[in-house]
Amino acid sequence: MNRLTCALTCLALGFTISTRADDKDATGKHLFILSGQSNMAGLRPEESFTPAVKKTFGPENVIVVKDAHGGQPIRRWYKNWKPAEGTEPKATGDLYDRLMTAVKAATKDQEVQSVTFVWMQGERDAREKHGAVYQASLEGLLGQLAGDLGRKDIHCVIGRLSDFDLENKRYPHWTIIRKAQFDFVE
């Protein structure tokens, strides 16, 4: 988990440091939103992620909101999720609503200079064979977040699925989800 935390911190800092360098006179807090399923749920940002971003931006200039839930598909965050075929689920977006409640509480009466969304999720969608709609779901989720925050400049860091099932034996769409994650950030 320490290597994962280090990698996420480096990626998030890379995005936001470039923002900071572009506008040295900008004011406001740097908001980091961490969400996804089990690997993100197990992440303890207070141990390394939060101290690293506070060291970079100053402790008074950082807001970190983490809300994650293990074993969940992206449809629990993306409200307009649609399967490639078949019946649509009854509930979508409930975990997103929970996340946004936390974000709104943390940013109330705060000026936000930058937003970085750190997302670690995909195993459940690989298992449920939703690879065909995963990239569109990521794009929709980021658009949903941008709309709700009233921003077009959200940085996004994706914790890509590992290479453990490159033969798609346990999770039929493992490599499809990995490619969708890669294509999304390209």
Question: What spans do the regions from the language model cover?
Answer:
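Positively charged n-region of N-terminal signal peptides that target proteins for export
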Residues: M1-L4
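Cell-envelope and extracellular/periplasmic
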Residues: A21-E186
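Bacterial N-terminal signal peptides
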Residues: C6-T16
